[in-house]
Design a protein with these regions (language model features):
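Phosphate- and divalent-cation-binding pockets in alpha/beta enzyme and binding domains
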Residues: 25-28, 104, 138, 164-165, ...
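Short amphipathic alpha-helical segments
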Residues: 27-31, 52-53, 107, 167-168, ...
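Active-site phosphate-binding/coordination module
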Residues: 1-87
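Asp-based, Mg2+/Mn2+-dependent phosphohydrolase catalytic module
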Residues: 168, 172-208
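Short, structured coil segments at secondary-structure junctions
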Residues: 33-35, 43, 113-115, 168-169, ...
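Short active-site oxyanion
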Residues: 11-16, 36-37, 151-152, 168-171, ...
Length: 208
């Protein structure tokens, strides 16, 4: 997949990464791929375009999200407020590993002093963030820095946190059918799923 991404970046269009992972997690992946795009991390909360010489931009303060997680731990038995290990590097949101309790978390937050916060599950973790903080925000800033029209961008994803990104770009591709709402928001879905679906998309962009 890395070699395909490099070829797309060289011959078709710049390849960027937009992820729910932290910047320290995404950066080495981007470096390993070696493409000319930018990074959007923490579901839109962190933007870094080192290729174009732009500094790291942190778009939110995750302290309220962390306090909300600590409060949730007093309401849900067995919930660890420390969340996933990468929270140690998280600046703009807070992530909890108890995905089975997602609906309960969402309901509790909705009736609390943190009702303005967004609660989104990616299947891997439950992300708690300030309102309006999503991939479309970070991507809009990153694209604006480069003078890119979002409608000339293709994006792929597989989880609910990708929906704002799908709504922003000109063409969106779902590489999983696990979430019906993700499939419904996408312009197309790959025949293969997951990593194989991403490879299918890259090959299609290369005309293979």
């Amino acid at each position: 997949m890395v070699s395909l991404a490099k070829r797309v970046d060289r011959d078709v269009m710049p390849v960027s990464l937009a992820s729910g992972r932290t910047l320290p997690n995404v950066t080495p992946i981007m470096q390993a791929i070696g493409t000319s795009g930018f990074i959007v991390a923490e579901n839109g909360g962190m933007v870094w375009d080192s290729i174009q010489g732009h500094g790291i931009r942190s778009l939110s303060d995750g302290s309220r999200a962390r306090k909300a997680a600590e409060w949730l731990a007093t309401k849900i038995e067995g919930l660890d407020p420390r969340g996933i290990e990468s929270n140690r590097w998280r600046e703009t949101e807070w992530c909890l590993s108890n995905t089975d309790s997602f609906e309960q978390m969402k309901s509790l937050i909705a009736d609390s002093e943190w009702s303005d916060l967004e609660v989104v599950s990616t299947g891997f973790a439950v992300h708690i963030a300030n309102p309006g903080l999503d991939k479309s925000l970070g991507l809009s800033i990153a694209m604006d820095q480069r003078g890119i029209d979002p409608k000339r961008v293709i994006a792929c994803g597989d989880a609910p946190n990708d929906i704002p990104m799908f709504d922003l770009v000109g063409f969106s591709v779902a590489v999983s059918d696990l979430y019906p709402e993700v499939v419904a928001s996408a312009d197309a879905i790959t025949e293969e799923r997951g990593k194989s679906g991403s490879i299918e998309l890259l090959k299609a962009l290369l005309g293979q």
